[in-house]
Every structure is written in structure tokens, then in C-alpha cells.
Design a protein with these regions (language model features):
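Hydrophobic alpha-helical transmembrane segments of integral membrane proteins
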Residues: 7-8
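N-terminal secretory signal peptides
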Residues: 17-65, 150
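Extended alpha-helical scaffolding segments
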Residues: 45-48, 60-153
Length: 153
């Protein structure tokens, strides 16, 4: 009996999770938005492709979450994130920023997490032919943060 109930609930559970297409077309609940940003942060190509559509309806807080997710995905799927950044840089989005913010936001505060992120992202961008601008921004901010840290000591 329990199996029958579980099987009957399965379609409702599956339908409750948004897809990139449905997320781009429909209004998202806060839990759907969290799900979408988690998928973007994981570097999921389908969800990366939905970012420009999500950016159109994002408020400032949601845009910040999307930028954070893109930055997290950068060392995981640099090619996919760079394609999204290229689209964002070429367009006009109410609240979203592109390369200048996403490529640098994880290294603006010194520390081990920033250092680890810098190393992984730098390596990923060196392997990606289209990553020069992002790499240039990343390295510039990283050097500036390190110089400020050294001057403060």
C-alpha cells in the first residue's frame, strides 16, 4: 500500500522541481529560485543557458545570488559561464552584472577560501581560449587585494 501511495506522489514531486525552460518562462517561488541558483552554481549547462532569462526578472537580491552562483560555477564549467557572461556583457539587464563582477567577486576578501578559488579559477581560465578578459580581471583584483593586505600588515 505504501508503494502505491509513493508511486502516485512521484509525478507531483517531479513536477514540483522547475526545469530551466519553466524557470525562464514562469514566476519562481523562493524555493524554486534557490533550486535554480544551486543548479547554476553546480555549472549545469542547461541552467547556465537559462541565466539571461532569469536575469530579466531578477530583483537586486536575486541578481546578486545569480552572480554568486555564476562565480561559484566558473572554475567548474568555465566555458559555460564565459558564454553566459558574454551574453550578459552584450545586453542590458536591470540588475545583473557580467564579467567585471562575476570574475572577481570571490577574491575581494583575502583568506584561504579566496586563495583556493583564485588558484582553481585561474587554472580553469588558462585552459579556456575565451577566458582572457575574465582572467585579466581576476588577476588584477587578486593582486590589488594582496597588495592592500600586505600594506595593512
Amino acid at each position: 500500500m505504501k508503494w502505491i501511495v509513493a508511486l502516485l506522489m512521484l509525478p507531483a514531486i517531479v513536477l514540483a522541481t522547475p526545469s530551466p525552460d519553466s524557470a525562464a518562462k514562469n514566476r519562481l517561488t523562493p524555493s524554486d529560485w534557490r533550486y535554480a541558483t544551486q543548479k547554476v552554481a553546480a555549472g549545469d549547462s542547461a541552467w547556465l543557458g537559462a541565466v539571461p532569462d532569469l536575469a530579466l526578472k531578477a530583483d537586486r537580491k536575486q541578481a546578486d545570488q545569480l552572480e554568486e552562483a555564476l562565480a561559484t560555477a566558473l572554475p567548474i564549467n568555465p566555458k559555460g559561464v564565459l558564454a553566459v557572461l558574454h551574453t550578459l556583457d552584450a545586453g542590458s539587464w536591470p540588475e545583473m552584472s557580467g564579467t567585471n563582477i562575476v570574475c572577481t567577486r570571490m577574491v575581494v576578501r583575502p583568506g584561504k577560501a579566496a586563495s583556493d578559488y583564485y588558484k582553481a579559477t585561474r587554472w580553469a581560465l588558462l585552459s579556456e581560449p575565451g577566458g582572457a578578459e575574465c582572467l585579466w580581471n581576476l588577476e588584477g583584483v587578486w593582486e590589488e587585494v594582496n597588495q592592500q593586505t600586505n600594506n595593512a600588515e
